[in-house]
Structures are given as C-alpha cells and as structure tokens.
C-alpha cells in the first residue's frame, strides 16, 4: 500500500521522532529511513528478493514484530530477546533462553544480513532466505513455542492471537491495506526490518572509501592493521610467504560467507556430542564492540572467547572432521597449519577490530518501539495525497479528511495549529473501513494540521 505523507503531517513526525522509542509512538506518516540508507559504492552483494524490497513502512511493522513478546506462546520472548541491538544483535548468553529451556546453538549476529550472496540462514543453512528464517524461531518449541508439537499451539494459533489485537489490525491495514494477518505478511515485514540492519561506519569503511582497492594500504590504518589486512586477504603460500586466506571464505568488503563453505572444524555442540552441520557464518563486521570486547563467545557454540582464540583455531585446525572445508586442509588430508608468529596473530586481531561500526548500536530505527511498560501508546495513520478535500470559500470553507481504517474500530481525529497541542475528536471507521471527518476550515484561520491516530487498547 503506497501511502504518501501529507505536508501537514511531516512536521509533526519530525517533532516526535526523538521520543518514539521512549513514548511508544509508531508514526506511519514520518517513517525512519530503512529503504534508502547510504551504501558504500564498493558494497555490491545483496540478497534482497525482487518480490520483497525494503520499504520504510514495511520495516516499521517488522520492527514492532521483532520486539513484541506476544509473538511467543507465553508473552515472555521476542526476537530481540536473543538478538540485542547493544550487542550487535546477538545474545550475551552462550545459549539463549526461550519459553521452554535454552537453545542448542549460540544466537547469530544480525549485522548486514542483506549484503551477502548467501541467501540461506541459520548456522546449518536450514532456512532458504531471511523471509523463511523469520518465522522459524516462532515455530520452535524451545525458542518461542508455536511449534504445533509437544503440546504447543501452532502458528495458526499465533495468527489468531495477533488478529484479535486491534493495534495489529491497525498496523497491518496501514502497511498492507487490510487487517488480514498471514505468515507471509509477517515474514515480509520481519525480513525487511532484519535486512535493513547495516553497519558501514567502521574504521575499515573510512579507509576503504579512499583506497583504490582492499589490497591497497589504508591511510587511516596503523602499520599493524594494514599488515593484518594483507594477511587476511592473501591466500597461504603466495609471494613472500603469502597470507592466511581468511578472505577465501569471508569475502571482503562485505565480509560475508562464501555460499560454498564447509564447516570450520568447530564441531562441538551445546547439548553435548558433535555437530558437523554448521556451515553458515554471519558477516565478520562488528565481531567486537567499540572497545574491542567480544559481545560474547564466537562460533555456533560460543566456545572461542576472544578473537585471538579464533585466530589460534585457524592457525592450528584440530583435526580433519566430516564436512571440513577443503580450504582448511593440507595434503595429504591433514588439518591446516599456518605457523603464524605472535606478531602476525596480533595484526590479524587488530585488523578484525577495525570492522566494528558505531551507529548500529544506538540508531533508534532499530531500537525497541515499545514504551517503558512494553506497550504502544499511539499509532499515527498514513494519509494519501488526496486525503484532504476542501469545499466552500471564506468563512464557510470546510475540509474533509479521509483515511483507511479497520472496519468498526474507534480512532481519533486530531487537529492542531502548532503541532504541539492537538484537539481530538472520536471517529469510528465505517463497516467498509472508511474514516471520514469534515471540519470547519475558514480561510482566515492559521494553517491547520490534520491526522488520524489510534490509541491501543490496554
């Protein structure tokens, strides 16, 4: 539903933007920029499907769904419970706590999930896309509990649950033009929000923006960081001894995973035993926070505590195991031995630290939209360009304001001359979902601003 903002509402949106996260306001007339964020020219990989491009309004709905604990069977767990913005959208705990215990793998970071040629998701790549991935945790017995097994309700039960919540009827109408909630609509909105999470303001990006290539020395890097970059990029055994070959699997400048990668030799399982199925890695961006501290342990089992531990693992792969990536083996069928010196290890760690950004941890468009009591306080409806219709002249002039609502649901119609103080009038959508209000608008009066809004039922 391609709604455009009316000028009358634009200024109001600017007024409340800074308070959105604190006050629980979702303003569909003044949307955060999800769809047209700046992307460096050197970033070229993109797994966004043609039938689900990121839109500001779709990602806004996705943000609400991502943070809403009502998507779990007992209202205690949301997507954000395991993917926390302040920790690069991963979990500080090794195993995340769901509605029925703890997860079998560590929570994967959600940084730059869009910017990869690998479309599959989860550590074991069992989801075919971000869309497919987005509702699988909801349908997991341990994570969010709508599995339809072991006495759990089904996803259909969740859809029934959400469909009975008026604020979701309002939001889905604002985004899709009707209050109907389906798994596909949820998947599309969640995927748009997740794909919008991007981080391109790191020290690496500052250097790459003025360099002719990744291989060139970056002017803002230290000698150690540039040395680490070269080790990362160059394959083993090349000129001058070569490098480490990290980029063979983790490809610069996106630092996404090569879709043809096997497992990396870390085959432990949080539940005990061995797990050879983990072939997917998140982007290597934002491995650590701005201070260089890990968000938590690395790998699917969080078994490596520091970046140096990670480097040591690849320096000496423990054994050739089932599914080990061939690039981590040496003939004849032996595990990789890089024989790195300590200064070389330190330079690799220094380089990996340069991949951490800044804004992704604090930007409010990726933050919790609910207020302090985990509720939304106001939803401002989108208005089409023909929503205002004037009739009459002079003191007899009137304006009719229309919008699309949920049939028979109560809204408020608001007017303001300063976008600070609003006068509200009750307005109920018709059986057909039409919202219509006609008010006096004398030409001699100051400019007036109009909007429809919905106050969620507690």
Model regions: which residues?
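Bacterial N-terminal signal peptides that target proteins for export
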Residues: 1-9
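Periplasmic c-type cytochrome electron-transfer domains
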Residues: 2, 21-383, 433-439, 458
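Bacterial N-terminal signal peptides
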Residues: 8-18
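Short, composition-biased motifs enriched in small/polar/acidic residues
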Residues: 379-458
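General secretory precursor processing signal
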Residues: 12-13, 82, 249, 451
């Amino acid at each position: 539903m391609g709604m455009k903002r009316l000028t009358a509402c634009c200024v109001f949106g600017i007024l409340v933007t800074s308070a959105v996260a604190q006050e629980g306001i979702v303003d569909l007339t003044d949307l955060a920029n999800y769809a047209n964020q700046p992307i460096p020219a050197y970033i070229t990989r993109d797994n966004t499907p043609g039938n689900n491009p990121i839109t500001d309004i779709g990602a806004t709905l996705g943000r609400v769904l991502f943070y809403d604990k009502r998507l779990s069977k007992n209202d205690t767990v949301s997507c954000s419970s395991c993917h926390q913005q302040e920790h690069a959208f991963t979990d500080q705990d090794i195993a995340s706590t769901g509605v029925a215990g703890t997860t079998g793998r560590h929570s994967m970071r959600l940084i730059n999930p869009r910017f990869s040629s690998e479309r599959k998701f989860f550590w074991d790549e069992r989801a075919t896309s971000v869309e497919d991935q987005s509702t699988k945790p909801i349908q997991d017995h341990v994570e969010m509990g709508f599995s339809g097994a072991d006495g759990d309700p089904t996803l259909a039960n969740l859809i029934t649950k959400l469909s009975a919540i008026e604020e979701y009827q309002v939001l889905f109408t604002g985004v899709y033009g009707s209050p109907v909630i389906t798994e596909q609509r949820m998947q599309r909105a969640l995927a748009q929000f997740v794909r919008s999470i991007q981080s391109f303001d790191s020290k690496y990006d500052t250097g790459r923006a003025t360099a002719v290539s990744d291989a060139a020395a970056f002017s803002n890097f230290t000698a150690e960081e540039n040395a680490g970059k070269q080790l990362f990029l160059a394959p083993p055994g090349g000129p001058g001894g070569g490098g480490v070959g990290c980029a063979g699997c983790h490809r610069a400048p996106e630092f996404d995973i090569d879709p043809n990668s096997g497992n990396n030799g870390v085959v432990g399982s949080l539940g005990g035993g061995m797990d050879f199925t983990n072939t997917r890695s998140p982007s290597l961006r934002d491995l650590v926070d701005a201070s260089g501290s890990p968000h938590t342990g690395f790998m699917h089992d969080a078994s490596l505590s520091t970046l140096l531990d990670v480097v040591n693992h690849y320096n000496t792969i423990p054994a050739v195991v089932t599914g080990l990536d061939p690039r981590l083996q040496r003939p004849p069928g032996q595990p990789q031995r890089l024989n790195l010196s300590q200064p070389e290890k330190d330079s690799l760690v220094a380089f990996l630290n340069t991949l951490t950004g800044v804004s992704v941890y604090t930007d409010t468009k990726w933050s919790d939209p609910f207020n302090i009591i985990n509720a939304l306080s106001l939803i401002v409806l989108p208005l089409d360009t023909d929503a205002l219709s004037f009739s009459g002249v002079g003191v007899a002039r009137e304006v009719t304001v229309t919008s699309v609502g949920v049939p028979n649901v109560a809204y408020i119609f608001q007017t303001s001359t300063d976008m600070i103080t609003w006068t509200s009038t009750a307005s109920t959508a018709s059986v057909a979902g039409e919202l219509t209000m006609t008010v006096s608008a004398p030409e001699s009066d100051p400019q007036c601003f109009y909007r429809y809004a919905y106050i969620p039922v507690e």
